[in-house]
């Protein structure tokens, strides 16, 4: 039961952060009105053509890290690295298609690649650490989802609008 609850909680966080940002805000991390976009990027690693290494590194590492908990949690249920990677790919594909279909953000092939990699890393790490840590991953996912919910509830009350600098 706890395994399914933790997976559902973390998946809800993932859905909220990838497809629902036009409908809420956490402080001044993003402007909800700027999140309604439909952009399709099919060229892998095109972020590197921008001239900066920081943007691509942040993007790719962030996508990978974002799916590692998902990989940990799915592996704790199915005990298969291959199935976990497939689930990571499937969820990422659904999120990317929803972003495009409903104009909720950028649909990027790199997201699909690095999200799947994150799920794979999470599964490999869960396998390496063994079952004794499965409850830890589950409770951490639930705690992270609870913190996220508090941040969403506090929303625009967080942060100082005078300290925001538009780049």
Specify the residue positions occupied by each region the protein language model found.
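Bulky hydrophobic segments
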Residues: 1-103, 124-167
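Alpha-helical transmembrane segments that form the membrane-embedded catalytic/substrate-binding core
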Residues: 103-129
